[in-house]
Amino acid sequence: MVGRRLDTLVRELSLAWCRSKGEPSCAVREDLLAEQAKAAEVIERSDGVILLKAPTGFGKTEIWTAPFFAQWLRGEWFAPRMYVVEPMHALLRQMKRRMEVYAQAVQGLGLPRLNVAEDHGEVAKPLFLYGGHIVLTTVDSLAYGYLARRVQRWREEGVERGRYSMPAGLLASAYIVLDEAHLIQDEAYLGPRVLGKIVCDLASAGAKVVISTATVPETFLKHIPCLGGRLTLGSGTVRRNVKVERRKGVLKAEEIECGKPTIVIVNTIERARRIYKQVRCGKKAVVHSLMRREDKERQLSKVLADGKVAEDAVLIGTQALEVGLDFSNLRALYTETAPVDALIQRIGRVGRDGDKAEAYIYEAEGDAPYPQTLMRATREALEKELLGGAALTSWEDAQRAVDKVYNEKAVEELMTRGLAWYGQALGYLQELSLFSYPPRGEVRIRPSNYITLVIADVKQDGDKGRYITEDDVERGAMKMSYTSRDDPRINALLQKVSTAYTVRGVATAKDETRYYLSELRRSWDGVEVVVVDRRDVEELYDEAGLDVAQLSGGGQKRKGRGRRRR
């Protein structure tokens, strides 16, 4: 009975998502349906932490979503809410749309309308992991919520108060899915280690956790000692119809052929901006992390038609394009060499409909932003086992390549870079307890931190001062990473603008939420949000986003404007 209900759910979810994309015909692969339903049943009956590994396009999302919806059909409950945890912001928007499509589809099976919410660093109003049956969030937001660092706080009689234990309590009774888990990594392998501790703590408290992935390395899983069952699906999957060719030298704009749906993925924002400005194709767009949200959408609209990339269009970008895109008709990929797991993601962008596609791998201008250890190991693998990249079209060969590159020696070399941060995290976790103030001191789940930069039209509200609206935040926010408060890019930005602001208060006026601002006069230490007037960055920001070359010493401070900030 349970199996039949899960079978029905997986079918309805698959068809609903297909129809939402405007596909001319939608059908369920009957040869996979029974395997998907069986995997969903294993997850439903399991406790603790379970691994779900399957190739891209196998239907992992339907597998781990079905058990949550099945609770309403059975009238038996294991979790009141589901957290879908993504490693990158680029994945959130499409996954939210997907969950909304699913929630609407299951109403036809007799389920109530389930709420889908977002809670992460780019939302205007943080929910602190509360606010929906299904909550879309990031690894950072989940981890810092559990660690009592991202919580609701206020001052009462001169004393700070906060709901420090609320996120941990919500998570301990929840169904948590770590989606695209193979992307949870960094140059010091700090994230996998700290997250492994958090996941096991939550599982021991009663949470059900699914680790969903295509090619997670075994060295990652070793940091989750509480891992229980493993579900590996899709063995013997047919090799994808993508011709991979490794080319000598670095990618030049004139080598990009126009006339078919094409994607170009390079390793740095500066390279993406340069190629975008040089490529001569008629329809072109660029997308990277240092762009306002509305500008990303405007760029994409230039090359999309009916939910697909136009036949004569080129889409250019950075790692932001590796995930979160579901354009089935891309026919050509031009990419720089990157760690093997990134190459797998990039090659996975083309030929998704089964038709023939091509992928060209060029040498990178340098190793940055990736660790030299991984770049060296990937180049060696491309020369030998991967046959110049051709083997990356096979899921099983790709998994073996990931394990070879992320071997114990390589990962140990990465981990030595983050020993101090990991030691701080362990000490913090030992002191952390319910119903008390969080421990003092810093804790990180990755070497880099982020500030939210909002580029918007700053307005004046009489004597109340300058402000921006909630809509301005939604349209104009982006994330800037830093490893220390001496970050040269952020300091250069603050020196080049006449005035920078931070948020001092929030109020509702004229049916809109307003964020009132105060000038950022000196240090940005402790500041999480920086606001800059759009008119003040006209020389630094254009249709291709923030000009990072100027923030790396390529530009001069504007005459007669700005103050030097330390």
UniProtKB/Swiss-Prot annotation:
Q: Which gene encodes it?
A: cas3
**Induction profile:** Repressed by 5 J/m2 ultraviolet light and 50 mM NaCl, slightly induced by 20 J/m2 ultraviolet light, 100 and 150 mM Nacl. Member of the csa5-cas7-cas5a-cas3-cas3'-cas8a2 operon.
What residues does the Helicase C-terminal domain cover?
250-400
> Is the Nucleotide-binding keyword given for this protein?
yes
Q: Which organism was this protein described from?
A: Thermoproteus tenax (strain ATCC 35583 / DSM 2078 / JCM 9277 / NBRC 100435 / Kra 1)
Q: What is its EC number?
A: 3.6.4.-
Q: Residues that bind ATP, according to the entry?
A: A54, P55, T56, G57, F58, G59, K60, T61
Q: What is this protein called?
A: CRISPR-associated helicase Cas3
Spell out the NCBIfam families in the cross-references: cas3_core
For this UniProt record, the keywords arranged alphabetically read as follows:
Antiviral defense, ATP-binding, Helicase, Hydrolase, Nucleotide-binding
Q: Which Pfam families match?
A: Cas3-like_C_2, DEAD
Give the function comment from the record. CRISPR (clustered regularly interspaced short palindromic repeat), is an adaptive immune system that provides protection against mobile genetic elements (viruses, transposable elements and conjugative plasmids). CRISPR clusters contain sequences complementary to antecedent mobile elements and target invading nucleic acids. CRISPR clusters are transcribed and processed into CRISPR RNA (crRNA). Cas3 plus Cascade participate in CRISPR interference, the third stage of CRISPR immunity. Probably unwinds dsDNA templates, thus providing substrates for CRISPR-associated endonuclease Cas3-HD.
Name a single GO cellular component. Answer: cytosol
Motif, DEAH box: chain positions:
179-182
Name a single GO biological process. Answer: defense response to virus
Quaternary structure annotation from Swiss-Prot or TrEMBL: Can form a Cascade complex with Csa5, Cas7, Cas5a, Cas3' and Cas8a2.
Recorded hits in InterPro entries, A to Z, give:
Cas3-like_dom, DEAD/DEAH_box_helicase_dom, DEAD_box_RNA_helicase, Helicase_ATP-bd, Helicase_C-like, Helicase_Cas3_CRISPR-ass_core, P-loop_NTPase
Keyword ATP-binding appears in the UniProt entry: yes
**GO molecular-function annotation terms?**
ATP binding; catalytic activity, acting on DNA; hydrolase activity; nucleic acid binding; RNA helicase activity
Indicate the segments forming the Helicase ATP-binding domain, all copies: 41-234
Q: Which family, according to the similarity comment?
A: Belongs to the CRISPR-associated helicase Cas3 family.
Name the Gene3D superfamilies on file: P-loop containing nucleotide triphosphate hydrolases
Domains: entry comment: Proteins of this family have an N-terminal nuclease domain and a C-terminal helicase/ATPase domain. In some CRISPR/Cas systems the domains are swapped, in others they are encoded separately.
